[in-house]
């Protein structure tokens, strides 16, 4: 893991080049959150990818522990079920929300706009959908398709977990589930949209 220390921001930017096991990531975040809450460690933003897994949020109910031998992890984040794996960029935040007036809605709003602006740089028109969390765009068939997901949790005044952006991942894993609990939904990736001109 590479640490890019931005002293003036008081935030550590962590970059992992290898796939990070989900158990390790959760353990790391929970320890870091505890230290941030105590003022021992700086806030952090972590860029990584996971091996192929499914994760479920607090509002998802299932007794299964795998889907086609891909493990399912029950998490404490918001949301339902989604897939993570190679080709999907994960960005985990460990941010003291107390310093930001405990405004979680504003934090989510800023994250969503950040993703939309980044995709716009790639000439991908992305947008939010009413009453749904995440970022959407049109897939190659003109369907509304999710390209980025968000799931957050707060502990001791520190927000953690984060967002995922589909860059060049296999979309077949999403077809085995109702992504984020939305039936008959479509999922896409940056590569899927741009492959004809890349």
Tell where the protein language model's regions lie, with residue ranges.
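Short, conserved charged micro-motifs
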Residues: 101-104, 161, 174, 198
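N-terminal lobe of the biotin/lipoate ligase/transferase fold
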Residues: 1-144, 154
